[in-house]
């Protein structure tokens, strides 16, 4: 059995907010597997234990650029160390230029994007200059280019959430409404086909374990799990979500009423999946005093 260290318990505690002893028990039961331990705690404490999955820590900006005909666009995320840098005029101008370059040139990857020419040099040149000027690390993290089947529509919320939607049919207002909905509801995919099988299976396992602990009959477990999975899919797939401006209809119903469909969408949330290192100032001072 893998050794359960204090740092492992601390990490699981930070991920889930579960009591320390429960974290240790879960890690022991999972034989040190952090993901499995988190799943065990979800069974015991509900979805609160999965809070780390949506925790966002890094700073930066998301920007979108769409060509005039609405047929080609890009969304980019560029990270900085602090929100102060993310509000810097030079930094914001750089992000906008990178988004425009991505939409124009359609680079294959971040390395190719970094080599593109913008005002004053390559993306990498300007990034390096900004680091020297502002004094913070700046990273071109990710981007996506969309060639539309319909027409591209975007929504950016405070530079922190960006959405790019390929809307077939409908009008600009419908597109904006759906893009804003995506930013608010944060669907994982357009429909159930885009949800990874392992994620669905994890939901089934959790549902079955919770049903067992609640004393439900063995014969009912599969039915309960099926219901839980269907509820989960309705919550995380765009077409099944209730429209945020009118929850009496789903996005799918809204689209049908407007003779429209969505070919694809991309959503970026600044820092999604990045954990910022948080310094314990008191511990740092104490450690320094021992030197």
UniProtKB/Swiss-Prot annotation:
SUPFAM superfamilies: Elongation factor Ts (EF-Ts), dimerisation domain, UBA-like. GO terms for molecular function: translation elongation factor activity. GO terms for cellular component: cytoplasm. Residues 82-85 are annotated as: Involved in Mg(2+) ion dislocation from EF-Tu. Transmembrane segments: none annotated. Keywords: Cytoplasm, Elongation factor, Protein biosynthesis. InterPro entries: EF-Ts_dimer_sf (IPR036402), Transl_elong_EFTs/EF1B (IPR001816), Transl_elong_EFTs/EF1B_dimer (IPR014039), UBA-like_sf (IPR009060). It is found in: Cytoplasm. Associates with the EF-Tu.GDP complex and induces the exchange of GDP to GTP. It remains bound to the aminoacyl-tRNA.EF-Tu.GTP complex up to the GTP hydrolysis stage on the ribosome. Belongs to the EF-Ts family. NCBIfam families: tsf. This is Elongation factor Ts. It comes from Methylobacillus flagellatus (strain ATCC 51484 / DSM 6875 / VKM B-1610 / KT). The gene is tsf.
